[in-house]
Amino acid sequence: MGQLDTRQKLAILADAAKYDASCASSGTSKRDSRGGKGVGSTEGMGICHAYAPDGRCISLLKILLTNSCIFDCHYCINRKNSNVRRARFTAQEVVQLTLAFYKRNYIEGLFLSSGIIHSSNYTMEQLVEVARSLREDHDFRGYIHLKTIPDADPELVHQAGLHADRVSINVELPTVGGLERLAPDKSAMRIEGAMKGMKGAIEDGRDARKKYRSAPKFAPAGQSTQMIVGADAASDGDIISRASTLYDRFRLRRVYYLSLIHI
């Protein structure tokens, strides 16, 4: 990978993020920086790029940390063997970009996902560090949506919920057979295990807030997921049944659908 400046990285990694549909910020509590405290806001302002299910226009900086990946999911343009131009941000580059875009009134928050680099744990550490730095180092009060990695250490995934408004773990495909065939590096059992753990942590966080007002919020906008439609032999009934099961088992805020893009 040649040396790229920030503008070039942004062009590549913002374009690569367009294949992720799960980008709505409904459900979070309102926070702002009026009164001179912190920076950022979850309330609508600036350039709107998406609509939340409650009808509000929202603007998010939607990027990947990197489009490099050690996995070879056949449906993904960023898969290991895909011939695309690669780029990578450091955690601090994403932090500074988010702050710069917010202060220019371009965005209300950040949607951050990533390809897998080095290992699932390493990548998850970088994603969490972005959110941690925004919240703790810069008192950022805007919206943060983090894509989490089911193969990562559960403690790292848990840390994501301490800093993000919403977290999401992609189920990828409607059927287990499709996942085994098209994404052999991924496991439906591990994905659902991570979603179950997140559901429990969200519920524990809500219970703690009921008992203790000082208890920290944990993913107040809940968790969501995304599945690709058209990549396997799943019927409409299979897709609807799968989504219904996910809503019931994991109390998801939303299941997003992305049509297969032939690459």
Please provide the spans of the model-predicted regions.
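Conserved small/polar residues in nucleotide/adenosyl-binding loops
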Residues: I261-I263
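Local cysteine-cluster metal-coordination motifs and their immediate loop/turn environment
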Residues: S68-N78
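Short alpha-helical segments and helix-capping/turn motifs at coil-helix boundaries
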Residues: E43-G46, V94-L97, D151-E155, I240-S241
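Flexible, acidic/Gly-rich N-terminal and inter-domain linker regions that tether
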Residues: M1-S68
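Catalytic cores of alpha/beta
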Residues: D153-L162, A233-L246
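Core AdoMet radical
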Residues: R79-V94, Y102-L127, S133-P154, G161-Y212, ...
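Eukaryotic partner-binding/assembly regions in large regulatory complexes
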Residues: Q226, S244-Y247, L252
